[in-house]
Structure formats: C-alpha cells, structure tokens
C-alpha cells in the first residue's frame, strides 16, 4: 500500500483522502454491462461557481437524518412513566409511510435503561393507525407491543429482540384480509425473539434468517423461511415457491401446503405430532385474539378437521440435533458429544 501511495505522490492514506483526480477506471475489469456508465461524478473534483478548485477534501457538514423529529421522540416522551418505573402505558397515535423504524428509538431507550431483559410483557402498548414505513418494530425489545391498524411496508420486525408486533386491517374493511397483502417483503429478517402476528398475506422472504421469533401470517410470497435457523412460523394460507431454501433450524407449519412449493434440500415434510398440535392451537388462538382474524377463528372452530391439514416443515439436521439431545439427556451422556456424533462432526 505504501508503494502504491508513493507512486501517486502521497505519504499516507490520510493524505490521499479526497484526491479524486488520481482515480481511474481499470481496463482489466471492463465488462459489457459497464458500457454507458458515467463515472464522472465519482472522479469529480470539487469546484466553486467560478470553477476554482476548492481546498475542502473531507466532509464539511454532517448528514441530518431527521432523528430529532422522528415519531419515536413522541413515543419516548409519552412513555416516560413506563421508562422511569415500568408503569404500564397505552398510547394511540397515527402513523404514515414516512415514519420509518417506528419503535426502534423507543426500544433502544428501554434497552439502555433495563438491559436486554427489557420490560415486563405489555408494559408499553402502542396502537398505530395508518400505513407504517419500512422497518416498523425493528430490534424491538421485550415489554413493547406495536399494534398497527392499517398496513406496513418492508422489514417489519427486522432484528426483533423480544417485542411484539401486530398488523391488522381496520375492522370496517370491505375485503377479505386473508386474500390481501398486509405487509411487504423480508419481514423478521434476523429476528432473535419475540412475536409477530399479521392478519393478511405478506411478501417475499418472510422470516429469512429468523433465529428465534414466532411469526403468524395468512399467506406468504416466494422464499419464505430462507436460511432460517430458529423460531417457529405458522402460515394459514398459500405460500410462494422455494420455501425453506437453506433452512437449517426452527420449524414451520403451513395450512394446506403445496409440497411442490418447498425446497426440500435441507428439510422434510411431516405431519405435526400431538405436541405440535397443542402448540399450534395456542399460536392460532393468540393470532385470533390479537388480530381478530376470522380465518384463524374458522380454523379453531373446526380444529379436529383443519388441524389435519397442517404440514410441518422440519430441517433434517435440526431434527437430528433435537433427537440426539433428547437421547443423551435420557441416557446421561454428554449432549455436545452426542450432537457432534449425530451431525457427523
């Protein structure tokens, strides 16, 4: 690096900062896709209105992301009682699609004061009305519930960390929620814990890289549960193609699954066992209670028949680990050694 800097006339990387005039394209990586690209803005040297080169070669002003005016500032102020002494509060506010990452600053305040354990369940309950912008409920910690009456954009519950997000349409809608989209793509990306209940269909890559959260939706797009490593997912409707691609952990349950839509390279399709059905009944019951879902209620009202229509999507290696753990504990053997043996480690 020092030799290359010297060839350019610099003694250090610090001296090279801002000297765009020494940049050039590399003919060795020329590609037909790059034809027509105008790279002049990258090579531009700052000049004033008279064409004189400016001396500034570094950032001269910071970016304003508008955080001082974010909706969360209002939420933090209104939830001060809960933040001070964990006193339960209920808030009701409108939301617009320009309000992004709603709940994230509030959640960071909870974590700053109470640590990763957050607050007791239901301490802060926020009802929002309208269309939420991207990433509502991102990184939300325990103790906060965001109850959105309306719809949401992409990344709902991204990095969810113990909180609860509910998305449901207004009660007076004239359409069937289970046949319409309620939220966008890549929901619960990288979520570690918490719950999300969605009364309606959602977009693609639902629960990609989910590692511990519970999610219930009434239909999903392509690539659902992609690279999922933990948590549980319930889908009460149709799925898109390539479901469970790269899914190495966690469990998904789909009502009326089309097996052709599943990527079976790493998973097996099974019938839910009795323990699964007990858990499923509870999850669907919670979905009905939180969202008012008529679809969930219809499934519950005919549970003996409808429960038989669920398919369990189980990662094969994950099942080996669970079985090895169970056997090792029953026999008093070392669990880690049993897991290594079961997975050919």
What would you call each of these model-derived segments?
Residues 2-11, 17-20, 41-345:
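Long, distal/terminal scaffolding or interaction modules
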Residues 36-39:
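Juxtamembrane/interface motifs at transmembrane-helix termini
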Residues 24-27:
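Polar, glycine-rich mid-to-C-terminal structural blocks
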